[in-house]
Amino acid sequence: MRERLNYVKEATDGYRAMAALNRYVEGCGLEHSLLELVKMRASQINGCAYCLDMHSKDARALGESEQRLYALNAWRETPFFTERERAALALTEAATLIANGHIADELYAEV
């Protein structure tokens, strides 16, 4: 996949901030495989092909199955995801689409 913009080179401070946030999130106790699913789902919603390529490779390296990666866009209709994963994916969608509404209290309670 051809890179359109080298963020490390062209937006060094922004990239450093994003990398620091990523390190923080990775240290919060969620398993890395779940974090990759969350990153992939947000990337699907945002339509970021570069991010999808990167996160799908990372997910596969962590042992994620092709079946689950292919079904991620329709996670609600599949039996492939645990309740914990479903809660994380629902929160991811709500937070990524925050401009369309808000994150419901019921969703926070699930997480």
List the predicted regions and their residue ranges.
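Short acidic alpha-helix initiation/capping motifs at coil-to-helix transition points
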Residues: 12-17, 47-51, 99-106
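Iron-sulfur (Fe-S) cluster-binding segments and ferredoxin-like electron-carrier domains
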Residues: 15-16, 52-71
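Beta-strand segments within the central parallel beta-sheet cores of soluble alpha/beta enzyme folds
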Residues: 36-39, 67-74
